[in-house]
Amino acid sequence: MPVPVAVQADPSRMVLRDTPQEKEPEEELKRLALKKAPPWVISCLLHMLLLIILGLWYITADPTKTGIFLDVSSPEMGEQLLDDSLSLSSDDLSIETAIVPPSELQAVEDPFASSKPEPTELALIGAKPMVNLDAPTINLALMGREPGTKEALLGKYGGNGESESAVKLGLAWLARYQRKDGSWSLKGPYRSGALNRRDLPESATAMALLAFQGAGNTHQRGEFQQQVAKGIKALLRMQGGNGNFFQQGDSNNWFYSHAQCTMAVCELYGMTKDEELRRPAELAIQFLIESQDPQLGGWRYLPRSDSDTSVTGWAVMAFQSARMAGLLVPSPVLAKIGEYLDQATPDGSQYGYQIATEPTLTMTADALLCRQYLGWRRDDPRLIAGADVVLKYLPRYEERDVYYWYYGTQMMHHMEGKYWPAWHAALRDMLVEHQEKSGAEKGSWDPKGEHPDRWANLGQGGRLYTTCLSLYMLEVYYRHLPIYGVRK
């Protein structure tokens, strides 16, 4: 089966300005040496000077760009960080795909709802030109996971020893339930697994890896290096030759699974720059690009067929992970997503599951996060109005909905201002308090209990799903840097 040509990336580029040098008086001996020197010596000196000047002079494609600086100043943490900016380009490529007709599928917001369309296959031959879309920040977002930076961000955004201990306990629980082949399952063998579905190792493995990686672990470093190394090998074994991460017989979680797997591979590549991960990441992104609904602009259950806000949200996060890793996404693809979101909202501030459906809190938080990643400014009136709506519905354990909380946590963290302190105050200690403290499930979050999670009531999600989303929320301080905290 033909596969895409790998995207060729240019190295990072920066503008270096020459600084004026003080002119020193010529000494008589130097003048005489130059005067008496043979012509070939003068020629060598001139060529050497030219090479030095060229070595210091990098030509940028966009001379209007300036350096990007991030302020993570915190009275508790002391010294902070600085960073450089990354800009990549690619060769022209092309892709052909098989077009799959629409199918009657149940409308659900849940990422693991059960319905089973017939499998399909995309024939990928190449990739379109990769062009960056100007957004508040792209390639700095993974820096927060680095030692030193991580501690600074914890202090700045409200993390503490208890929240970090909860993260370590949760990761230890995931490590205990990693299977011998390196994968994970959404069904078990832990208690309260997802019901009425197969193991879904693609989603389960990707979600576990994202939790480990969010805390700074990779296959090259970290307390859970071994688990990540085994997990990424297992995940790559699940990838098809044309880049897809779903298997024959899967239900309508196809693109949920594919987007989550794409996020995991792209983030790990971005954190390590391991070239063995670049090709799988590119193939996964290219498959997602060519699966976009050409009419509405989003994604749903089948390639190039229909759109909903829930699946589209995961696709946007996959693209953002790619961009953070330096793998650029065609700007027309991102612009088309914006066109879909324009149709899924009555006013730009609240969003429904599909076009012409009533807005919901979960889809509003999801879509507003997409808008942030697609370039909306923090002072956009529509973004502010939507964040004000979400602010009225802070997390409450009696109304558990980790899917809503997951999107709300990221969106509010990026908003900062009045939004993040209020949301965070309702979230952090509640998550820590209700984590399992003993027994075989120590470190996890029970999807059932006295106040079951919304998706546990439907037999969907399960303990690994609930635990991973809870870990993402407790890693929010450093998992992705707040995009509006970047000064250009």
Question: How would you label these PLM feature ranges?
Answer:
Residues M1-E24:
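N-terminal intrinsically disordered, acidic low-complexity segments at the extreme N-terminus
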